[in-house]
Structure formats: structure tokens, C-alpha cells
Amino acid sequence: MSKDGNLDTSEFDPLANKEYTEEQKQTLEQEQKEFLSQTTTPALEADDGFIVTSASFAQSTPSMSALSGNISPDSQTSDPITKAVRETIIQPQKDNLIEQILKDLAALTDRDLAEQKRKEIEEEKEKDKTLSTFFGNPANREFIDKALENPELKKKLESIEIAGYKNVHNTFSAASGYPGGFKPVQWENHVSANDLRATVVKNDAGDELCTLNETTVKTKPFTLAKQDGTQVQISSYREIDFPIKLDKADGSMHLSMVALKADGTKPSKDKAVYFTAHYEEGPNGKPQLKEISSPKPLKFAGTGDDAIAYIEHGGEIYTLAVTRGKYKEMMKEVELNQGQSVDLSQAEDIIIGQGQSKEQPLITPQQTTSSSVEPPQYKQQVPPITPTNQPLQPETSQMPQSQQVNPNLLNTATALSGSMQDLLNYVNAGLTKAIDSNKQIDLIKEAATAILNNEKSDIAEKQANIIALAENTVNNKNLKPDAKVTGVNAVLETIKNDQNTPNLEKSKMLEATVAIVLNSENLEPKQKQQMLEKAVDVGLSLKDDASRAAAIDGIKDVVIKSNLSPEDKMLIAVGDKVNVSELSNAEKQKLLGSVLKKGVEAQVLSPAQQQLMQQHLYKIMAEQTKKDTIKKVNDILFDPLSNTELKTTNIQAITSNVLDGPATAEVKGEIIQAITNTIAGSSLEAQDKAAIIKGVGETIATHSDTSLSLPNKALIMASAEKGIAESQTNLPDRELMTKGLVDGIYEGKGGPEITKAVSSGIDNSNINDSEKEALKKAKDAASEAALDRDTQNLTEGFKGQNIEEHKPHDDIYNKAREVINAVNPVIEALEKSKEPVVSAEERIVQETSSILNNISKLAVEKVNNFRAMLSPNGNLKTLEEKKEEAIKKVDELVKAFGTKSSTEEQQSFIKTNLIDDKTLSKEVRLQTIDKLLQEQKRSEAIENPSVKTEDVRVVSGKSKLKPISKDNPDIEKAKMVVGRDRVNIKGNIKIMGALMNARDIIQSENLNKSTPIKRESSPPQR
């Protein structure tokens, strides 16, 4: 090569860096012909060789990468060695390969396709005899692949390769007279170790370029299998420390190292193949590694950087003097120097991998081979690694079974060993060829598996490759829309099932895949949603909650940031998937709440979507509340230290908390149904269960109307009965509990609507008709018994409605008293009168007659009023309405009492509002006192450690959660305690005493304190 870079093959020898006269050229050509006509003795060993010049040189093995055009066209080739490689090796191989392809096409059943390909070959051959376009087209790989399966063709290609190497090395060797040509390496043993050798390489001027070091490795024998299934043991190989950077002297250097046989010896020259490194003079004059060439398919003995390279050639195994780590270093340097690797193994690995699944890996005692993906920037120089199946044990001869490995997986892994782009090319070619969508999906899935199983790739590279595969699937024009969905979902499923990728890294893959899908212009919204939902499913299937949260958060953010319009963003789909997942309610509540919050903030959820998601959230919260509530109920029911009365009180408190909660009436009904169902299904005695159920019914019936309307009470009561009816206990027990529920309603003075709700609960329960009829009879019997009790206590009931001052007998008594009071002055006046107008008897008779007449009218009026009050058509308030007013007043008084913080204020309240205020009926005041006494007793129980306090709840539902006892940290339960309830025990006793004293005073009140009638012994004398 001249200094100005101009090339002239007819006048310039790049190796000798000199020009020849015409006479010298003719003499040299004659010497070459004579040399080529000589035969080489097969017994002669092949030698390592090197050539040192200041000119560029390229040597190559026959390769499919060369067939694909990696070597520049003839018009651009000036290097005589490269030209010789092309003419003696590559082109003859191409000719033989095309000949076999045409034979295969002649036998192809699809005649149209066969004719199309035949014409394509013939037409291109007229333009370019190298057929670079044909061999470079991925769509033609299936034909190349099939041709290479022919054993006769393989033998021809191998013989061409061996003869070509022999020819090139002999033609351009120093021994043949070629100036500055190849010459054997003179290795010198290291003085301190027999397994180390070295040689110094110098340029034409005698300046040292580098020192090569060779190490002979004697290892414990390991076994590998050839393609035909036979086994070979390797016990010795060598490593050469090929230089990466050369900066000692100027010039070019080409190292060609012979591959060793399995026993560590050199093959004969007629079977030799070589690993060659080409160092070309760089801009600064120093040699730069620009190209390497190696025999066909190159494999490595393991996954570590110290794994030795090997090939199978001519049915024999050969080891090369380069390790995996050194090979990668050299490839990176080639890329850095913008060189070109003419590497048969890379391209042929891909082609052979497509059609020959029987390609077997090398197996070592300590490690297995595996696919390897180099960083993308080195993708054109990535060494091919054939994947492995099961490793052999040390010193064990075991033949790998090809049927144990998925052939397609070998194909994808082999393609991936070249580069990610090679894998995508292979996949796309397969997608184009495959008509069956199932085969297309299988191919995509196998590619994803190969990526994730590649042990040489770090996690970042795996992520990048998975994303590239997903993007390739979305954008592939040969896939139908539904197939794209299935293909991407197959990639997602592969991510899900991969056992080696950490969960947090999986979540990143999901996030990136969703971003590709949502931002794609090649998908419809329906298809995008299907892929999005699959990604969410995979994210929710991750093994730990942190990874699941990371996955959903990442997907959520991608959805919000996607290029879709706000109304088209599919965040609701994420929420729906979370809602129907099998996660715990607590985790679903957390995830769904996060999605809803973010969606509202980003304004990507419509009002209807927000409402729907909020409903889902409420339902999840209700489910969790139900679960927690049932646990508390079970703890109470199975507490051996509490009696039925205490169990009832505690479950009443739980029931009250449910009724006071923020959930809808329907949800409250579901929880109450679960409570009664749990009670009914417990192992308690039937009478005890009925007593507890009665307490539940009473709590519902007496609950404040301000937080629970009458229709909602009825709905919840129906649910309570449904829980009883659908329990798995026997029918007599259910009948008894139904009676208990009805008794609780009457005890709580519930109206007819509440009682009727019990029948509704029976009707809506999932039991047979005979059981429904039996439960209704039990309900009716309980109602009749309660009505009988009410009839017997009717008078007491009237007292409770504040009508005692208006009873007829009281009015008659008062009017009689008025008569006496009116008559006495008349009598006294008559006695003093000296001139009486009429006699006293007449006057008394007249007055008495008038008074009695008035009394009669008043009695009739009172009786009529009494009848009107009892009449269903009367205009007066009904008994139920007056009861409700009384209950409401009691609640108001109790609430007002609760606002008093000190004992003195509470005592003053009792005197002012309960003892002195006679405008309130006795019944209201007494009920208020009873309710306040109940609260004081609860407060006492809380303060007194000797009193059972587990699961006590204040009806108000506004308490703070505090531990039961600091002395018992093992107790997990908690109690709800209102701050004011934690009073001093002495003050508590004072209040209870004041309440009981007030109760006695109210109960002893006279119905009327008017003066008794003054009785005379005889009428006055006239």
C-alpha cells in the first residue's frame, strides 16, 4: 500500500511494499506456478505462521458472512491475499451451494415459489456472479439452510476450505519465495516452565512489534460430543495472548495460528485450519487490530472468560488458541478500529442453527456452554455460542440427546449469539415464512426465552433485548393485529415465568413494554388495552408486594404519560385488573387507591370512571371490614372466659360500630349478615346463640335514626335474618334464633316495618321452601307472643307516652273536687244570709246538677278522645311515633350529658334535667337514667382490670384505639375507649349514685298532689 492510499494490484505488492519490473513479475509468477504444482506430504505438521510488513493484509475463511458480502467486491479489493481467498475459497463454495439450492428448488412442491427463486438467482447471477444480494436476504435463509443439510455438499465445502487455506499459505509464504511472506513462528520455551513459550515479532526494520506468549493447558479430561453423536475427550489445549494494542514500532502484522487436535497436537498440513488476527498499519504508523478470521462454527467450552474456543471440522474436533474473554476483547478492538471481521462462524452459526438442531455443544466438567449476547455496539463481531442442555459430571462420557432440546430454541439462541439484530432478523424471517399464527407465536416466545436464558447477558442487556423484541413484534408487518397481541402477550408471559430475572427488574420490562404498546401507531385501542391488561396481570403475579407495587406504579405512570389523548388513556383498565385480582383486600385497597389518586390528579379519569373505581374501593374496604369484623366476632364467641351476657354485650358493640360506619346500607347489611351467620354457625348452645342474636336485633332496632333511616334498618334486619336462615346449623336452632331476632326487635321497640323485614330476609335466603315456611312460622309465633306481652302492659305503655294527666278518672276526680270547692262557699253564704232567695237544698241541688252535667260532658269528651287516640284513623300521633320521639329525646339527653367533663357538672345536669324538669315524662327521664347507668358501668369495667374488657365498644363509635394492658403485651386485641370514660373510679361511683337517687325520686313522684276532698258529717242546718 502506498502512503497516499492508492492501490494498483498490477504494479504494487502490499506485502513487500515494493514495485516489480515486468521481468521480475514474470519470474515470480513462474516460481509460484512451480510451487503450486508440487505436492505436500500429508505427514508434515502444520505450523503457526506470521507475516510482518508495513502493508495491509486480509485473510479469511470461507464463510456465509463473506457470502453475504462482508468482503468488499472485487472492484474494491487490492490485497492479493484477500483476492486469493475470494477466488480459491469463497467463490467455489458459493458455486457449489447455489448448485445444491437449484437442485432443491427442482424438487420443491410449490412450483410457483421454486420458479420465482430460480429466476431470482439467474437474473442476479448475470449482474453479480457473487450473488451477494441473494445470500444477504434473510428470506432466502431457508433455502441456504436446507442446502447445507446435504452431507455431500458439506464435504465439498470443507475440502474447498482446507485446500484453499493450504494454497493461500503456501502461495504467500516466505518459503515459497514470496517476499516478506508467511513464515513459521519460532517458539522458545520459557526458562521456568515447560508449559510456557514465547516468541518476539519484529517488523522489516528489525524493531520489536510485540512478544507473543503461548500457554499449554493440561486439564482434567472433559468430554464433548460431535454432530454425529460420537464423543471426544479433551485433556490439553493452548492459549495465546493475542495483543490488543501495539505501540512499540510501526508496521503491519498478521498472526495465523493453527487449530490443535483433540489431543493437543498439530494436524497435518492437508487438514489444517487457522485462527488469524490481522493488524493493519494505523494513521500513526502503529499496527491496529482490524480483522480476525476463524473457521466455521466457533464455540466455547463454557460461559467463563477462560473458556477455550473449539470447532468441528471434517468430522474432527479442534481447539483454537483463543479464550472467550480474549475473543471478546479482540472483537471490541476491531469495532473500535472500525475494522471488519470476516468470520465464517458468525454467519454460518445463524444459518446452520436454522436447519440443524443437531448441532451439539461442548460440555466441560465444571461448566456448560450457553448463549452469549455481547453489548449492542459490538453486535457485528459477537462470537457465536451454541446453547447447551445438561452438563456432564467430571470424567463422565455422556452423549447429549438432541431431542431433549427444543430445536427452535437452539435456533433462536444461536441467532442471539451473533447479536440481537441477528436474532430479530431470524425471527422476522420466520414470521414471514410461517403462515400458521401459532408457529409465529411459538417463534416469538422462543426468542424471548433465549434472551432471558442468556447467562452471559447482564440484566440491563436482557431488558434492552426484551424491549427490542416487543417493539419488533408490534411493528412487524407480517403479523396480523390479533397475532401482535398474542405475540406481545407471549413475551409478557415469558417474563412472568422466568425464574432467573429479579422481580423488580421484571417490573421494569413490563413498564417498557407497555410504553411501546401504548405509543405505537400500528395498533388499535382494543389491541392496546388487551396488551396493557396482560402486563398488569403479570405485574400482579410477581412474588412480593414491593415488586407488585413497583410494577403497577410503573405501568400507571406509563399510561398517564402515553401519547394517547386524556379521554383515551386506559387507566381504568389498570384499576379493573387490580380490583378483580386475587390479592388481599389490604393490598388491593392500597394499589387501587394509588391508581385512583394519580388518575384524579392527572385528570385522565372521567367522572363515571372515578365513581366506578371509588365503588370498587368501597367494596374492597367493606370486604376487609367484614373480614376483620368476623375475626373479632369469632374471638368473642370462642372466648372461654366470657359468659353469654358478656358475649352479647360485646357483639352488640361491634354491631353498633358497623351501623355507625361510612359504608352504604347494602354493605352494612352484608357485614351484619356475616355476623349473624357466624353466630349461628358457632358451637355454642342454641339458647345462647338465640340470646346473642336477640341482642343484635335489639341493637339494630334501637339504633339512632339520624345515622340509619327506617328503610335502611329494614334492609339490614332482612340481611341479619338471611345470615341465620342460610347458616349450616339445624333447622330447630335456626327457628329459635329467628325468634330471638324478633324478640330483639320488640325489645328495641322496632316498628312493623322492621318486623316485616325478617320475613323478607327469609324469602330472599337460599334455602328450600319447607325451611322458609318453618322459619316464617317461628317468626309469627314470636310476634304474637310479643303482642300479648304488649297488651298486658298496655297501661304501662300509655304512661310512657305522657298521657297520665289526661286520663278520664283523673279528670272526674278533679271535677268532683271543683264541685265541692264551688258548693262550700254557697253553703257558707246561705248560712250567713238573712234573706235567702231559695232554700239551701234547692241551691245545692241546682249546683250539683249543673256540675254533674258538666262532669258528664267532660267524661264523654275524654272517652271520645281516648277512642280517637286508639283508632287507626285518628289524627293523634301513633304509639310508634311517640316512642320514636321519646327515644330521640333520650339520645339527646345522653349526648348532652356526655359534654359535661367534671363530676360536679354531671351531678348538676342530673338534678336540673332529670329530677326538676317535670315537662319531660317519667318514662323519658327513667330511660335516660338507665342508659347513663349502662355507660357508667362500662366505664367502670374499663378502669377496673378485674372486669372483662375485651372487645368492648362505645356506641358512639368515635373512640380512639388503645391497648388493653401494658402488662399483657401478648394480647393482640384492642378496645375502643372514649376519653371521658377513663374517669377516676371515685367520681364514677358518685355519678352512679346520683343517677340511682334520681331514679328513686322520679319513681316515687305522686300522680297528683292536690288537696284531698273535705268531708262533712252532715249537711248544714237550715
UniProtKB/Swiss-Prot annotation:
Ranges for region Disordered: 1-41, 355-403
Top-level taxon of the source organism: Bacteria
Main location: cytoplasm
Subcellular location: Cytoplasm
UniProt KW Zinc keyword: no
Keywords noted in UniProt: Cytoplasm
Listed GO CC annotations: cytoplasm
Bias type Basic and acidic residues, positions: 19-34
Polar residues: compositionally biased ranges: 355-380, 387-403
InterPro entries according to UniProt: Rickettsia_antigen_120kDa (IPR020954)
Heme is among the record's keywords: no
Pfam family, one: 120_Rick_ant
The protein, known as: Antigenic heat-stable 120 kDa protein
